[in-house]
């Protein structure tokens, strides 16, 4: 589940170098970014800082290039992670948990670094807009399949109720089967569950699992799985 961004001095420097490579000159950057509007003209690349609450946020081109840079940095990080595995002798396919319509990264670029696309799906079933929820979840399946034009995996789905949605409802009988088959119907090759055994503690100790704190195999959820 890659995400987040860093605004430290090292990342600021890397961002400026990325901009230099893209635009070559500060004059060209000013022209492409239309910085003359509202007197945002830069005199050098060293004056540019990432958009943040304590900096500039009104230049659309700055915001867009920053997001592109964050994707570039993340993809480069994934590339080096995989390289380390390959150097260690692993030939297994690689993947990463993608997340819904996550706006922090360009998943089409991230998908180029991994062998198999997989994503975490946690739809909020059993609300008034259940049909819209099904449409939305199906659209995400289609998006994930389109990232590489190949079948994908549903990496995470909750077999019962989550611990973090505003109202975390237990799935009705048959709902887990329907949700899993929706992934297969949209081009998926597998539907996996998080988690197999409920955590003993920490943030997700009340997150649903195939085997709950009771520990038995005679629960409805276990039988549904």
Describe each region flagged by the PLM:
Residues 1-139:
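Polysaccharide-binding and catalytic clefts of secreted carbohydrate-active enzymes
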Residues 41-51, 91, 111-115, 122-225:
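Carbohydrate-binding surfaces of carbohydrate-active enzymes
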């Amino acid at each position: 589940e890659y995400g987040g961004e860093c605004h430290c001095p090292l990342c600021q420097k890397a961002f400026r170098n990325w901009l230099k490579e893209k635009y070559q000159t500060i004059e060209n950057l000013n022209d492409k970014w239309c910085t003359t509007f509202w007197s945002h003209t830069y005199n050098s690349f060293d004056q540019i800082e990432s958009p943040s609450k304590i900096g500039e946020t009104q230049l659309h081109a700055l915001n867009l290039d920053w997001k592109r840079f964050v994707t570039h940095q993340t993809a480069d990080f994934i590339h080096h992670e995989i390289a380390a595995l390959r150097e260690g002798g692993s030939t297994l396919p690689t993947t990463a948990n993608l997340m819904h319509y996550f706006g922090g990264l360009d998943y089409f670029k991230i998908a180029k670094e991994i062998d198999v696309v997989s994503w975490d799906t946690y739809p909020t079933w059993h609300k008034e807009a259940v049909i819209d929820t099904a449409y939305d979840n199906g659209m995400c399946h289609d998006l994930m399949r389109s990232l590489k034009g190949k079948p994908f995996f549903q990496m995470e789905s909750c077999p019962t109720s989550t611990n973090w949605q505003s109202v975390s409802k237990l799935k009705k009988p048959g709902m887990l089967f329907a949700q899993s088959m929706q992934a297969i119907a949209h081009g998926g090759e597998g539907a996996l569950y998080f988690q197999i055994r409920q955590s003993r503690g920490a943030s997700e100790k009340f997150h649903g699992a195939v085997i709950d704190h009771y520990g038995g195999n005679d629960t409805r959820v276990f039988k549904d799985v």
